[in-house]
Amino acid sequence: MTCTGVGLHSGAPVSLRIRPANAGAGIVFHRTDLDGFAIEASGRNVARVSYATSLMKKGVLISTTEHLLSAFTGVGIDNAIVELDNLELPILDGSARPFVEMIQKAGIRKQRKARTYLRIVREIELREGDKFIAVYPADAYSVSYSINFPHPLIGKQSFCVRLTNGSYLKEIAPARTFGFLHEADAMRQQGLIRGASIENAIVLNRDEVLNPPLRFPDEFVRHKVLDLIGDLALLGKQILGSVVADRAGHAMHTALVSRILRDRSYWEETALEDEPAMPALASAASLSV
């Protein structure tokens, strides 16, 4: 599978190709512009978490990983090789839907290895001021997220989803990233959102959306759920647990990942009896963007 686009923050053109990987390989990024240097999609490689999640290994950076990793989780892909020829993944339309469509077009097959999960066995709660994130033991993966923005079209929003029966594809994948016009100049001076446009983000001025319509009335909080799912993919396995977040962001998402990986007493590895094999990409496909 291949696609081309621009990085949300760098504004740099990038080509991305996704290939099948062996069972147990996990998700691995390869910088083809740097002789295929490999960076594993792991919480141990998290480097930057300001407005996006970035991974770094031996000084080599991969930026804005969350949308693709979220799509992988949403369709159940555990193993893939992701090749890109620049430092930042393409933003495409600002959601995970284009990635999901690419994967669906390629097809998914079962691999000859039992799929295992990371089952939460002990609650974890993290707080930072008015920000909060936690995960509690549960038999399935669910997310409950709340946000509060001082904007008349956002305000307080909450959304809950259980990641079963295609809920991700319908309820989460289409939700786009968003930003505020009055913050754009300052962010660009910081080297951010140089690739942002009304084609790849919801853009708001002080009282309206500049590129309507919204895909959901609460698209803003749904996108936060999308980001969280992508960041939690850095655990290396899909979790069985109930995640609750309030005004969190990439920094808190990845802090939770680090806490889980650091202390084995919070989780156990388990397989489900009715899911005997790992899903993987079946073939290659392409998407023009």
How does the language model describe each region?
Residues 1-78, 83-289:
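C-terminal regulatory domains involved in ligand/effector binding and gene-expression control
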